[in-house]
């Protein structure tokens, strides 16, 4: 893991920036998935705090064993999997606990597509199965 190895880090100053804030991006890539954690600066928030917040989220993801899908990727992959389920294919993934956004996305997909989305919570891991509605 590269968390303490500065050779895998890149700090870039932008000449003529178009905004007043900073951005922190942490990408964690593995053989099957790539997760990107983003923090954007805001007025009255120190750059160090922005970085700490993003690092906290990245460390939480790294600390989850056998959970390839992060918090904000879950809702994004539900749409193509939902479309596949509407065509008769069943698929699943394991994620961190779903966000409210993902749960809302689940409800919308079930309303507009003829699919069922099952959620099985197993400790900190959540298995999501998207299948054709029976």
Language-model segment annotations:
Residues 90-134:
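C-terminal functional modules
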Residues 57-65, 75, 84-95:
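Structural motif
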Residues 1-3:
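Short, small-residue-biased leader/transition segments that mark boundaries at the very start
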């Amino acid at each position: 893991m590269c968390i303490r190895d500065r050779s895998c880090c890149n700090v870039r100053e932008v000449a003529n920036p178009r905004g007043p804030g900073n951005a922190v991006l942490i990408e964690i890539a593995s053989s099957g998935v790539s997760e990107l954690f983003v923090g954007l600066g805001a007025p009255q928030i120190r750059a160090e705090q922005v970085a700490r917040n993003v690092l906290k989220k990245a460390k939480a993801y790294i600390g989850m064993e056998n959970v390839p899908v992060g918090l904000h990727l879950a809702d994004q992959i539900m749409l193509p999997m939902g479309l596949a389920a509407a065509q008769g294919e069943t698929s699943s993934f394991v994620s961190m606990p779903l966000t409210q956004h993902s749960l809302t996305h689940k409800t919308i997909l079930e309303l507009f597509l003829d699919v069922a989305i099952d959620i099985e919570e197993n400790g900190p891991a959540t298995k999501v199965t998207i299948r054709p509605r029976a």
